[in-house]
């Protein structure tokens, strides 16, 4: 509850307003189950995870899911094609690597803290390949990322000169 209260305070401090159902009690959800079916089915709401490691302060994440895209909608190009989640990490808190086969996702750093995202490509069969690069759109700019041994593969906030210098980009 402390993590949720702290997160709610932080979210509000940025002028973001959560939907009314964010504050419903379990009994309110039960009484409104039919009305809130889309919210419930999409597994929206509060989530605090330590990824099963039992070390939240080292490896954990707070999430509030506002919308959760459906794979079949994304594949057909209509309906709820994207997810919208508020993510809060503590200083130096890690999130384990994961992959999406198909995902429409924007990562927006609203708080302005330094954020490092490591990106890796796939082999021709779609499997993880730490030697493969890829393409990502960053603030509307197409960026090619290369997997280069010995270099940190990740960006610190798009547009940083240090990243560009490290990668040899203009």
Show the residue positions of the predicted features:
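A short, N-terminal "cap"/entry segment at the start of jelly-roll beta-barrel domains
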Residues: 1-82
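Short beta-strand segments in beta-sandwich/barrel cores
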Residues: 85, 93-95, 114-117, 158
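Conserved metal-binding segment of the jelly-roll/cupin
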Residues: 90, 146-170
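Glycine- and acidic-residue-biased ligand/ion/polar-headgroup-sensing regions
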Residues: 90-91, 103-125, 130, 138-140
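Surface-exposed acidic, glycine/proline-enriched linker/cap segments
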Residues: 132-148
């Amino acid at each position: 509850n402390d993590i949720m209260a702290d997160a709610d305070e932080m979210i509000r401090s940025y002028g973001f307003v959560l939907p009314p159902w964010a504050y419903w009690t379990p009994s309110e959800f039960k009484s409104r189950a039919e009305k809130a079916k889309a919210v419930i089915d999409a597994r929206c709401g509060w989530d605090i995870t330590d990824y099963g490691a039992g070390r939240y302060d080292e490896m954990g994440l707070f999430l509030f899911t506002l919308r959760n895209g459906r794979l079949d909608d994304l594949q057909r190009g209509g309906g709820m094609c994207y997810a919208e989640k508020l993510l809060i990490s503590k200083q130096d808190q890690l999130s384990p690597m994961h992959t999406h086969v198909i995902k429409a996702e924007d990562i927006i750093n609203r708080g302005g803290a330094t954020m490092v995202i490591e990106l890796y490509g796939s082999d021709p069969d779609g499997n993880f390949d730490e030697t493969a690069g890829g393409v990502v759109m960053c603030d509307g700019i197409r960026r090619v990322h290369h997997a280069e041994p010995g270099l940190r593969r990740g960006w610190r906030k798009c547009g940083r000169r240090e990243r560009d210098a490290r990668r040899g980009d203009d």
